[in-house]
Amino acid sequence: MGDPAKLAAGIKAALDATAIAPAAAPPTQQPPVDLNTAGIDAALGRKGNPDGGLYKFNLARQDTIVDDGHLVPPTFGVTTTVNFQPLGEGTAAINGDIVMTGPEVQKVIQALRAGNISLVTVHNHSLTDEPRLFYLHYWAVDNAVTLAKAMRAALDATNLQPAK
């Protein structure tokens, strides 16, 4: 892994060489989300967050994830994401990724197919993660609450942390 200060200095040098500007601060107030967010929250059994006109869920697993002997926190991309993009009149496009263990994969696929949510890809990110994780990307367009209800079955097939 290496010394964190040296790693950070190396990343900064690489970013400086690309002339990529630092990220702007997020707006202090998010634009309104033109969806029934209360209905989406009720269907998923948890509360999402507005972000740039989208309505998002970022859901951590209950498992402790270890990769190559190192603890991997949820903020390092081992979370399930559900994004709702308003399309008007209660319709949304959803996409994201569901993090699963091997025994969960078929249950999630069956739940998504039953809800008419398209599977985009199933893949993994690491060779040595424990438990072994798989990621499923999905996509659908329909009534936002209908999509949330369909997603709930898929999410319930995984070992997510309980809603707060």
Mark where each language-model region is.
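Intrinsic disorder/low-complexity detector
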Residues: 16-60, 65-69, 73, 158-164
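Intrinsic, low-complexity N-terminal interaction/targeting segments
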Residues: 63-88, 122
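Extended intrinsically disordered, low-complexity coil regions enriched in Ser, Thr, Gly, Ala
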Residues: 7, 72-77, 102-127
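Acidic/histidine-rich, surface-exposed loop or edge segments in extracytoplasmic proteins
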Residues: 87-95
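Hydrophobic, ordered structural segments
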Residues: 1-33, 140-162
